Amino acid sequence: IDIGGTGIKGDIVNVETGEMITERHRIPTPSSRKPDEMAEVVAQIVEHFKYKGPVGCGFPSIVKEGVCKSEGNLHKSWVGVNIDELFTKVSGQPFTVLNDADAAGYASMNYGVGKGRNGLVIMTTIGTGLGSGVFHNGILLPNFELGQIPYKKFKKIEDWAAASAKEREGLSY
């Protein structure tokens, strides 16, 4: 499951091959972006697939041992929430939650262009925010958060470089 600022998406993935087994299912992120409402959407996605078993989840903030350490593009009430426990309780399935860009980076390192690469590998995700999964010689440097770097007149670089900035400024590709 991928938690985003505008949508929460889920799919069943073959962890041996990285292939998506089902069609992606998306539900808009609740406008409050608060824990209880978002956990209910996560449970709806699990139920949509009638899935029973462990669930991996990418989350758009700093996550340490399943606990949210920053609000990212969500509500400030997320800070300090044990996301693993919340999603497990609401869905009835065991969850492992990590930073969303770190999760995308793991996918690239195991199934994509990063597979077998040494040195520095950076996965950049562009959405409501700007994420980064950074690996050195195959080892994750967790919660690197390049999008949080202060930049010029903006609070942080993702305010200038994320897809949300394109929409805010009325830009096109």
Region locations from a protein language model:
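Short glycine-aspartate micro-motif
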Residues: 1-2, 54-56, 121-125
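Short beta-strand scaffold segments in enzyme catalytic cores
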Residues: 8-12, 61, 130-135
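Glycine-rich phosphate-binding loop and adjoining helix at the ATP-binding site
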Residues: 23, 31-43, 47, 51-55, ...
